[in-house]
């Protein structure tokens, strides 16, 4: 019996492994919440994570940047399933119905810029999401500027948008906390 259970679990884990995983349930106000999505060149299986399959490594890296961007965070807050306080539960239909950056529509130059950014930031230590927003953490700003640039925003529009979004989202998350 034990061997069949192990075999069954191996099959389950094998089916769920992916190089991109997205948090299914998280507390945006928690000090430990630093990212919402994670890339691994070796397929992984995360507890309470959505496994996102079917993408090559480059596209998965671009999606990881997107899922961790402030635009995606805004989208999550607007369409969230609130559980308690700043806890958010992300359902599969929310991922499927959300707006996403499409790597297939990017130019080679845009892809290169995003992949270069990913490589530069992949070992960078990040504070919590709330601290990133409140303190305009430089790496979050770089991610957001890169995402907004490939979406067609110019520098002035980007700065105006981020000047509005960072304090607004900080306030929203802090209010959810109470």
Positions of the model-derived regions?
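Polybasic, glycine- and aromatic-enriched phosphate-binding surface used to engage nucleic acids
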Residues: 1-116
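Non-catalytic DNA-recognition/assembly elements of restriction-modification systems
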Residues: 104-178
